[in-house]
């Protein structure tokens, strides 16, 4: 199975600051990658794909980029509601596999 490795595993930022999460694949030819945000007590929510396409209702401060092995999710200006655990998921090859998650804390 393809291993997805996220960095960092946690980060703490103040509102208005940018944030960036990286995801690296153990296989080099990925075409499709999704990002998800899971908030406490909620199901994961789809965020931008690697080609910056956004799921409906995703704010434009979120952007995704990357190809091959290295992918990045960027948040232009973090807001309090962005706190939670972010996961990357490769959907190029079965079985689809997730990164271990990155916990984003938004300082008060």
Swiss-Prot record:
PROSITE patterns: IG_LIKE
Protein name: Ig kappa chain V region GOM
Region Complementarity-determining-3: start-end pairs: 89-97
Region (Disordered): 44-66
Region of interest called Complementarity-determining-1, as start-end residue ranges on this chain: 24-34
Pfam families: V-set (PF07686)
Coiled-coil intervals, chain numbering: none
Keywords associated with the record: Adaptive immunity, Disulfide bond, Immunity, Immunoglobulin
Database matches in CDD domains: IgV_L_kappa
Chain intervals for the UniProt region annotation (Framework-1): 1-23
Annotated organism of origin: Canis lupus familiaris
Comment field (misc): Peptides were aligned by homology with human kappa chains.
